[in-house]
């Protein structure tokens, strides 16, 4: 729990804040997450997405951010030794992966009490149930978009998951 309390001065929190952490590789789904962000921004939603990680797609993702005019919405922050302050500051943790094992970072978001939206890949339902403790969407681009749209447009849906993730956090412990 101490790691989440370390000071982090580069987290802008002037609007709904989404965070995603992972290697910038194709199976992690960051390209489709940026596509969803472009659609949501075009629809007038105010939010910010911080992506923490490094990898082979870094240049392509920077280009997609420029092409889709997302410079004021999406930031690639690179690798961070301690991602906890970013996750803890988030309004929503997003896991857009095509393929994922048991996700340590999703478990960490649960422990930190951060609502989660994830695509359905291995291990997610073990952590979140059938969308009981976090929104688990079909593993498709459109379902990811729809889930993000719901979290931004439906305060009752967001608040529901805000409460449920706190219930689920009681099953986990950071001290292990």
Model-flagged regions — what are they?
Residues 115-118:
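Short hydrophobic beta-strand element within catalytic cores of glycosyltransferases
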Residues 16, 20-39, 45, 49, ...:
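A conserved mid-protein helix/loop that constitutes part of the nucleotide-sugar donor-binding site
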Residues 62-78:
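Nucleotide-activated donor-binding/catalytic signature segment of Leloir-type glycosyltransferases, i.e.
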Residues 157-171:
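A short, well-ordered alpha-helix in the C-terminal region of glycosyltransferases
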Residues 130-141, 150-155:
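Conserved acidic donor-binding segment of nucleotide-sugar-dependent glycosyltransferases
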Residues 79, 98:
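Aromatic "clamp/platform" in nucleotide-sugar-dependent glycosyltransferases that forms part
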Residues 108, 121-131, 135-136:
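Short acidic/histidine- and often glycine-rich active-site loop of Leloir-type glycosyltransferases
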Residues 84, 103, 107-111, 125-126:
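Short alpha-helical segment that forms part of, or immediately flanks, the ligand-binding pocket
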